[in-house]
Regions:
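Short, extreme N-terminal segment that most often corresponds to the first beta-strand
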Residues: 1-21
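Short, flexible N-terminal segments of the mature chain
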Residues: 14-41
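Acidic, low-complexity intrinsically disordered segments
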Residues: 34-87
Length: 87
């Protein structure tokens, strides 16, 4: 089971936050689906994700996206995904 804490940050403060849960084990191949589900729940655009985002999540249990990672305009400074199985 995976649990991902997703949050949008504005001026170093959490604006929106959810815990995303999925019964399957984490796989990098499914990262896009997790990202789409999380963004739909937060009602934000889906960012363009690169290999570096997946690699950072796998190696450090977190990753983040900034304005340049989005095609659409956003109303936050940073979008953070963090492993939440310990929460």
């Amino acid at each position: 089971m995976i649990r991902i804490w997703a949050k949008t940050i504005v001026e170093e403060k959490v604006q929106k936050s959810i815990i995303y849960e999925n019964s399957e084990n984490f796989t990098p191949e499914n990262f896009q689906q997790y990202l789409e589900d999380i963004c739909a729940k937060l009602d934000i655009p889906v960012p363009v994700y690169l290999t570096k985002h997946i690699r950072h999540y796998v190696n450090f249990n977190n990753t983040f996206f900034v304005e340049s990672d989005f095609v659409e305009s956003i109303d936050f400074d940073k979008f953070v995904l963090e492993e939440a199985s310990n929460y």
